[in-house]
């Protein structure tokens, strides 16, 4: 990219582009970072359920940890997106791909607790709003990440990598896989456009990997 820039500015010849070696870049080469199941529960339990902001944060954490919502999904969630009668939550994610996810009693009760006893009076139709005036929708996905990061530090958990809100999404997928869920099930819940995106989680299923690991001479299996 830098050499192309130099060539466009006539600082070097175009023929020099062919002298720059191509660096291999493998798709899905990295490992997804996730929290252990007990750490996810500690994270959720760190919220002060008697305080308004604690009710809000707990409901958000449960949506991230139980349904795999993205930070942007939380920001754009509106009151009319929740079908209380039938127990569904409507989410419009990446590329405006809409999905209907089951609303469990645990998550539903947490949201109700916030709406009835924690959410300030406001004309905004956003489910989750700022805890201080002006009471409007959260500004961006960054606000959700800050919220999760604060909960991680409050729970005394060492974060395994970069990112905060997405960490709970990875944790859910990894937990589902370890408990026997198929990649197709995980792909459906996480609303991946292709199951190929979900396949990266197969790398963290150590139990399954042990079953297919080939023995190496003079080296015992894991």
Question: Residue locations for each model-derived region?
Answer:
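Conserved catalytic core of the tyrosine transesterase superfamily
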Residues: 1-222
